[in-house]
Curated annotation (Swiss-Prot):
Biased composition regions of type Polar residues, renumbered to the chain: 21-44
Secreted in keyword set: yes
Keywords for this protein: Fimbrium, Secreted, Virulence
Listed name of the protein: Hrp pili protein HrpA
Location (main, coarse): secreted
Localization of this protein: Secreted; Fimbrium
Family: Belongs to the HrpA type 2 family.
Length: 68
């Protein structure tokens, strides 16, 4: 009878840990996916800002080149 109780407790503990590991893995994957999306959006915005900055600098340099 004691062996049966120990087996039952062990099985219950294993199921609890398995469930916790599954939830942890899912949460981790979701967080990584969210970070990947955010990193991509930031990269796109950085590229747009760089292009805008280059355009402004080009216009500024062209204006400086005009001599009266």
């Amino acid at each position: 009878m004691a062996g049966s109780s120990l087996t039952s407790a062990s099985t219950s503990a294993s199921k609890t840990l398995e469930s916790a590991m599954g939830q942890s893995l899912t949460e981790s994957a979701n967080a990584q996916a969210s970070k990947m999306k955010m990193d991509t959006q930031n990269s796109i915005l950085d590229g747009k800002m760089d292009s805008a900055s280059k355009s402004i600098n080009s216009g500024h340099n062209a204006a400086k080149a005009i001599q009266f």
